Amino acid sequence: GHGAVTSPQTQRGYTAFVHTKLSRVIGASGIHTGTMSFGKMEGDASDKNIGFMLQDDVADGPYYRQEWEGMKQTTPIISGGMNALRLPAFFENLGHSNVILTAGGGAFGHKDGPKQGAISCAQGEESWKLWKAGTYGDVSLSDGVVEYAKTHEELKGAFLTFQKDADQIYPGWKEKLGYTGESSVQAASFNWQKKDLAAAFVGASTTRKASSVARRALDQSSRYADLSLTEEDLIKNGQHVLVAYIMKPKAGYDYLATAAHFAAESSTGTNVNVCTTDDFTKTVDALVYYIDPENEEMKIAYPTALFDRNITDGRAMMCSVLTLSIGNNQGMGDVDYGKIYDIYFPPQYLRLFDGPSCCVIDMWRILGRGTVGGGLVVGTIIKPKLGLQPKPFGQACYGFWQGGDFIKNDEPQGNQTFCQMNECIPEVVKAMRAAQEETGQGKLFSANITADDPNEMIARAKYILNQMGPMAENCAFLVDGYVAGGTAVTVARRNFPKQFLHYHRAGHGAVTSPQTQRGYTAFVHTKLSRVIGASGIHTGTMSFGKMEGDASDKNIGFMLQDDVADGPYYRQEWEGMKQTTPIISGGMNALRLPAFFENLGHSNVILTAGGGAFGHKDGPKQGAISCAQGEESWKLWKAGTYGDVSLSDGVVEYAKTHEELKGAFLTFQKDADQIYPGWKEKLGYTGESSVQAASFNWQKKDLAAAFVGASTTRKASSVARRALDQSSRYADLSLTEEDLIKNGQHVLVAYIMKPKAGYDYLATAAHFAAESSTGTNVNVCTTDDFTKTVDALVYYIDPENEEMKIAYPTALFDRNITDGRAMMCSVLTLSIGNNQGMGDVDYGKIYDIYFPPQYLRLFDGPSCCVIDMWRILGRGTVGGGLVVGTIIKPKLGLQPKPFGQACYGFWQGGDFIKNDEPQGNQTFCQMNECIPEVVKAMRAAQEETGQGKLFSANITADDPNEMIARAKYILNQMGPMAENCAFLVDGYVAGGTAVTVARRNFPKQFLHYHRAGHGAVTSPQTQRGYTAFVHTKLSRVIGASGIHTGTMSFGKMEGDASDKNIGFMLQDDVADGPYYRQEWEGMKQTTPIISGGMNALRLPAFFENLGHSNVILTAGGGAFGHKDGPKQGAISCAQGEESWKLWKAGTYGDVSLSDGVVEYAKTHEELKGAFLTFQKDADQIYPGWKEKLGYTGESSVQAASFNWQKKDLAAAFVGASTTRKASSVARRALDQSSRYADLSLTEEDLIKNGQHVLVAYIMKPKAGYDYLATAAHFAAESSTGTNVNVCTTDDFTKTVDALVYYIDPENEEMKIAYPTALFDRNITDGRAMMCSVLTLSIGNNQGMGDVDYGKIYDIYFPPQYLRLFDGPSCCVIDMWRILGRGTVGGGLVVGTIIKPKLGLQPKPFGQACYGFWQGGDFIKNDEPQGNQTFCQMNECIPEVVKAMRAAQEETGQGKLFSANITADDPNEMIARAKYILNQMGPMAENCAFLVDGYVAGGTAVTVARRNFPKQFLHYHRAGHGAVTSPQTQRGYTAFVHTKLSRVIGASGIHTGTMSFGKMEGDA
């Protein structure tokens, strides 16, 4: 499409030379450069200079010499009519052949097919090289190529195919090559049957018919034109986008033939016939259906099927429409020009576009004008457009808002160094707040978020919204839609649908100008803006301002605002799509407005008058008011207020009594003279013909002192240093819990805490609170009065019972800079951060936590819950009961088809299937093969059962981008069943950041929180971290729809019947925890998900304990272990619920629950089958069941005897059936050592083999359990097994079993080898994922009922697998270089943590940095420091930058700063990081990024590593002691934790002080 601007015909925009040069600057690896006159596209032999500019390090342009200084080259890509015969001369002109060829017809048009066509092109190059080397003697290039062709059949074939080119370039070729045939041969005669040899990789062969279309030069009218089609029928049919062009062929070309070639290039064709065309292809040809050669009119119908669609949601893409309709056709050699004058979208296709989400009606509402006929929004552009600094910019806003409504950034205003966004936006906010308070009216601001990088746009937008706070709706987002492209508009539309999207079209005139006969008109441009979602667009002033335009441009306004509107060629029905509001600017002032409104017919537009406001003689306030009066004067004249007078006279009459409009006459006298003849006499003006404009006295701005703030005097601190007993400061036992809750300003946390021997309880508790908030182990000189106001306070202790309660001010916790939301990682960093490794604390564990309502509202909470599942299942929204689900077993090892078959089998009787937590994108079961099988199974099961089905897909990954890619792929595959899909996130191993990724990016999906691995912290054995109760409670706060809660002692995992309180806390609106009552204030529930050894027999007692059955069951063995298969297993579980309900209702009289269930089973075969399958459970729970059910068989039956042959009934959806062998593994209780242990394996061989990750554990079985049997069960749960044999295991599955290869029961040592194929891989790039390694190695095995404890003490990664991880991108060497110490042995980097860790405000923080940097090298944020309200990042980081700059200048040495970017939301992390780098400017490399890797999870570390590889990645491990402490026999050691940090890419990690400091450790 570039030809619309770069064509020599077009005297606007830039040339093709400039366009391609810019591509190298912004990072293109290659760009299409045309063929320099040697192909079919426009061009000239001198265009070789384009190639030199792209590839050389120094190159001359038409005017300038450019030195590229080692910047990599951009490779020319040549295409457009090129074939083997044209190449030699092209290379000779260019001087080399180091280019990329993309020959369409040159390959697929070759008479012998694409293989020979490709070879012929390579031979074209070879022939030129040999001629150049003198191989053929002193002959012409033409003769040399012919000589080569004599012995090379493919090049010879090119002569026979492209004979016109041969005749022109190689005269006499026929005689030289001995060719005596016809002058034309049938092209595209490639025998497609040959492709059958490749059946293995392309699937079954397709019979193809030979093309019957003769090669008729470029006349393709027989295929690409059908003048019998009528526009009426095409519109009625609704399957085509219609486009009307003004098109002129080059001299000598037939109009219809050229039009058909135009349509061909715009759809399925090219300049020759090609062998790949088949019958279907022709069904999507674009067709010329109307031509008028005399008036150069041409209309083309494009089938909507031609256009690309999103893979994520099926929406339409405007870039695809434009790529076809004004793409390659803009540079065709036979077309003089072609420009779109109108375009029609059929309703069905139009609905696939976004359309506007907001419009002027939303502005009127904010301005208090209602929603109908709100009239003119009086706005301005801050002038000068560049050069104002932040305070003057804010003052200018304040001045205008005294009388006006709306201010926009001028399109180039953004984040210039002299007016940075983080300094300017706060000034705008202050001005808006002050103006609204003073005028009592709403005000509006349009902030420019345009950027090259969508991430930057999003970061800007979020920063602005955060600054705007409660005034966020008053903020529009301006996007320079022409220069940044439609992608930028879509970024704004889809990420911020609540904001008015202000489309600025600066630069459009390069294409739309009437002078330009390419591209599209301004009418078309603005029409497209409505389609893609602009709320408002600049439309020009229809000849009433200074820009190009015409009074007839009012049709643009009608097309943008009406629901049915006529364009030059087509009537468009918008079907209720919201309007796009015209924005008028460019020389407009109060005097020009009345006639503009009269031409348009209304005033429902937005005005942005720069000079019209700031040029007014009395200042911007009066300028704004004068514009509003211009509208009012027109309305009164229109209503007949001034009688039968001209509009001109009516406006003058109004001005007599309105000083501001009168002032506009005195200011803009030339306009007045032209539009209002005789105005001076009528207004009694006798002065000079011109007055001094814009004489506004800026001193008046001082009246606005209230909004810019007064200076603050700071007092010196009088706090003496008092060793470690900080109880006088960090404890206040007079505080009552009742008052703290009533006050609503504190998060309350209840701990079980024990000091080390010899330490005072209160003193230790106070030190704990100090380390958790503003203090440390000594008093520091930087503490001031404010700091103490945010101290955490111990308000209750009970040393005897080891109870301690701390109140944390909510102001302590970090907030998003993007939207002000709260962050759970900040809560955890403080409440279980460094306090988990304190030298005076034996242990400290959270047993309850209370969130005050005002703070709780800042968290997401769930967006979906079980109610949404019930609705899909057809059960209404109240009391829908048990959702019967399963986990596909084996958890790993199934390939895609068996996986789909297993889903289908279960869905015959069940509701819900979840991926097991390690299932993802393993090489043996890749997501792009597995998910389609799941979709087929779901569709078939829904059709057969007539009931909705649900699937929970695992999207967990280290990288949030990978998570989002997975989720979007899955939704795309699910299509109309997307709502049936939940997203599973391994929230413990991947961290809360991963949960937030899912919650905020996919709020319509049920968010399934899997907690595998949590037992490493929550286990009752572990006296650090938090309890399972707290863990699940926090899941509701951060937005989980459902979370695994254990089975309350009724399954195989750890737990207790009293765990039902977890369920109450998750589902009730008011619930009591061990210490606090939590009021949820209507926050949606988080549904308990129960799994782990559950089956139909265990369910009734579970429901009776809980009191209801409104939970989700995921029974693996309970379904797939059922003797009759998963369908009957699922039904049996539903019957387990039903039997409990009937017993509860008294159906079976006054009998025990046990007897009631047995009674039900007598008449229900599936539940009866559960008794026969799970006999040990039956014996334990239902004594005497055999007699009651009349069972006289053996005491055990073969489990999993499901007959897989039944699956063949589903052949339609699973494809060909696969023969399956019956399992020969006998059920040996939990002894799986015959399968999951092989003690003959040697470590040496395993390492040599390189296919296993080896993990060394200290593991102790529960009393009475065999060591090897327990170890094998541990390996089974960590890979492909479960607690029973299941019917889905096949031969392949066993090849990826984890194997115990060494045990030493006496020393409790166990080693397991995990095949690397077990671990999940990214779908985006195939990289490995640490969360997958941890999910298996310390996942469910951390809560097994037969394991007392199991902890990783070492881990080995084989080289081939290790290479799939990131590893560090930077290290201390990079720091030494900045510090001027070289790259070897640079020694100690002397750093500090700014203390107090919390409580310093920005200026004291910067002063503290400056003081340290006088002698030191490196400063880090303490891990909780972020964006607290008292020390916001946008105020603090500039102080750090000033301090760093000053210190570097004074000391002459580099300085380093590590900024904390940790957040729950990866988008927030990226926004913080980009903001900081922007502030750092040329000192960006001096900045490291700190991530709280333990509390935020490895996902957060990966966000930093992959998005900012040039920054030192500083891994803070606060909180790790909850797992790594020697006291804790679960999880992993500190050694393993730090080792893993290197694998995932940390540049540095806190390692403790090896006993030489205050934290735990050893030499």
UniProtKB/Swiss-Prot annotation:
Modified residues (N6-carboxylysine): K408, K914, K1420
GO biological process: reductive pentose-phosphate cycle
Family annotation (CDD domains): RuBisCO_large_II
GO molecular function list: magnesium ion binding; monooxygenase activity; ribulose-bisphosphate carboxylase activity
SS bonds (residue pairs): none
Cofactor stoichiometry and binding remark: Binds 1 Mg(2+) ion per subunit.
Active site residues per record: K383 (proton acceptor), H504 (proton acceptor), K889 (proton acceptor), H1010 (proton acceptor), K1395 (proton acceptor), H1516 (proton acceptor)
Post-translational events: In Western blots an approximately 220 kDa polyprotein and 2 smaller proteins of about 55 and 52 kDa are detected, suggesting the polyprotein may be cleaved at one end of the linker and then at the other end to give mature RuBisCO.
Something else known: The basic functional RuBisCO is composed of a large chain homodimer in a 'head-to-tail' conformation. In contrast to form I RuBisCO, the form II RuBisCO are composed solely of large subunits. Synthesized as an approximately 220 kDa polyprotein, imported into chloroplasts and subsequently cleaved into 4 mature RuBisCO proteins. Only the 2 middle RuBisCO copies are complete in this entry. There are estimated to be at least 10 copies of this polyprotein gene.
Subunit structure: Homodimer.
Family stated for the protein in its record: Belongs to the RuBisCO large chain family. Type II subfamily.
UniProt-recorded name of the protein: Ribulose bisphosphate carboxylase
Name of encoding gene: rbcL
